[in-house]
Amino acid sequence: MRTTILCLALIPALAAAQTAPQPAPSAPRPKKVLTPDQIAFQAQMNVYYAEHALLATAATSAYTAEMAREKADACPNATAAYDINLCLAHEDEITDANYRAFTAAVRAMLALPQPTFPGETTPYVGPTGPEATPATNTAAFDAAEAAWHAYATAECNAVDTLWRSGTIVNAMVGYCELRMARTRLHELNDAYEMLLYH
């Protein structure tokens, strides 16, 4: 009942608002004319975005391919140790190729110099320090990759040591290498998510 009364009371107010004179449209704003420097900057940004998109596509394609492989059982039809070892060696090669494609694309994205807006000084120094440059980005990426490779090698060497006396050693090392590379791909995808997907 209250709703009906409220609706009936609002009808005249809404009708009056619709029939009230509308303000005259404001004059159109003059179109901004870009300077030659701004036009050049826009062209440089278009090239930058196109290169960035190609590299992001390459990285995400390699990542997606490896994540699909990760969901499948590695070597489901291999039963003998020899067959398992051959299969895992092949699986490691494919994973390594996807890993190299992903990291090469991410590193190339980090190395892309972003065009500077006319009149802007670079690198910008913010409250926490200077902004990253292609040189600092790639140096940090290379250092992290070198540290990770050393860690992965040490981890799989420890697995090798544990299983050295048995015929299973090569399979265990193969699984270790697959696990380490895929875990690292997840880490890198998370670390560079904003670069890859935005």
Indicate residue ranges for each PLM-predicted region:
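Hydrophobic h-region of N-terminal signal peptides that target proteins for export
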Residues: 9-17
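N-terminal alpha-helical modules
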Residues: 18-198
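Positively charged n-region of N-terminal signal peptides that target proteins for export
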Residues: 1-4
